[in-house]
Amino acid sequence: MFMNDQVYDLLRQAVIASRTLVDMSNKTIKNILRNTADHLLENQNTILEANAEDLSRIDPSDQKYDRLKLTKERLQTMADDMRSVAVLSSPIGKVLHEITRPNGMLIRKVSVPFGVIGIIYEARPNVTFDVFSLCFKSGNACVLKGGSDASLSNHALVNIIHQVLQKYRININTCILLPPNREVTAALLGAVGLVDLIIPRGSSSLINFVRNNTRVPVIETGAGICHTYFDKKGDKDKGRAIINNAKTRRVSVCNALDCLVLHRERLNDLPYICGDLQKNNVIIYADEPSYKVLVTCYPANLIQLAVEESFGTEFLDYKMSIRTVNNIREAIDHITRYSSKHSECIVSESPKTINFFLQKIDAACVYANVSTAFTDGSQFGMGAEIGISTQKLHARGPMALEELTTYKYLIEGSGQIRS
């Protein structure tokens, strides 16, 4: 068993490593990240073998399976995202505000790294690479606590990172992978003074556990209970494409659609709007008005009457609910009640209705005529993301380089003293 003292010894090494990153040039960081991306692809067979062994312990019907699975295409995406991060400008040392006081004192507010960032995540080995690239680029050491389901995949990926760091004679404790034991999680959450920030990424139960048990500051990457409101002035072709994409592109991700909110005047368009959902065997939990329409045309084994639990659920599966409303205000009320404040969408051709929706919906990402599948750091031009924050303090939405920095004030003078 890994003891607390062993965890704290590793964290102290991460603190030491984080101090060495301050002096590293952006050019060196860029070269290391590019080399790591190349090294990943050169060793993809090794990674896929480790991943296959992890997958062999999971039922393919389990929601975790798709999140855990790595393919050559996904490894290519991971490498591309790392290269995208590499070429971004450094978020460190930026002058955020500058003022010269009447007494001649110069005050500058300058961006700096947090120091050591702990990431707790589940069966998502791609997170390992995303986290390292973003933390390294922003001058932070990262401490990774992955789930046991992905332990072999994570270990293989961190080995790739360490091999490149050693090539450049960089302290490998810049990126530490902790054992996947629960006792280690408790030690990490109590590491005040060693870890500057914890970011949990995973299920609502994981996030709630971290929130309720940590002594270290946390930025939550919350569950995604996502809605799309199809307005009475919505384009049915756009709506069909957006709804299907948001639901079926990848059902296991946090930006996937969970509930279609439908204006009552568009009930007759529902069979057309749901046409692609039927092709993808999406199970629909429909309220009474939408059920009466769909029961005549949607496969009987894929349609059920909704109950209260059908709403406010993050399905992470080929399942969704439908709620019928009389107007935009009812739509907003429903979304406000059940939303996790992640990503919400309206499909409408009315500028007035769109603006009202964008202003009134309280979520990290609010879309008009765009699939919620775009809530992603790479799609926002950030290179990659460390998670989607659903809280409001410090960071909200896709968290990338800027969100992994804090700031300090630099004050210069010529001998000023305060009266």
UniProtKB/Swiss-Prot annotation:
Pathway: Amino-acid biosynthesis; L-proline biosynthesis; L-glutamate 5-semialdehyde from L-glutamate: step 2/2. GO terms for cellular component: cytoplasm. It is an enzyme of class 1 (oxidoreductase). GO terms for biological process: L-proline biosynthetic process. Keywords: Amino-acid biosynthesis, Cytoplasm, NADP, Oxidoreductase, Proline biosynthesis. Coiled coil: none annotated. It is found in: Cytoplasm. InterPro entries: Ald_DH/histidinol_DH (IPR016161), Ald_DH_C (IPR016163), Ald_DH_N (IPR016162), G-glutamylP_reductase_CS (IPR020593), Glu-5-SA_DH (IPR012134), GPR_dom (IPR000965). Gene3D superfamilies: Aldehyde Dehydrogenase, Chain A, domain 1, Aldehyde Dehydrogenase, Chain A, domain 2. One of its GO terms (molecular function) is glutamate-5-semialdehyde dehydrogenase activity. NCBIfam families: PRK00197.1 (NF001221), proA (TIGR00407). Catalyzes the NADPH-dependent reduction of L-glutamate 5-phosphate into L-glutamate 5-semialdehyde and phosphate. The product spontaneously undergoes cyclization to form 1-pyrroline-5-carboxylate. Belongs to the gamma-glutamyl phosphate reductase family. This is Gamma-glutamyl phosphate reductase. It comes from Azobacteroides pseudotrichonymphae genomovar. CFP2. The lineage of its organism: Bacteria, Pseudomonadati, Bacteroidota, Bacteroidia, Bacteroidales.
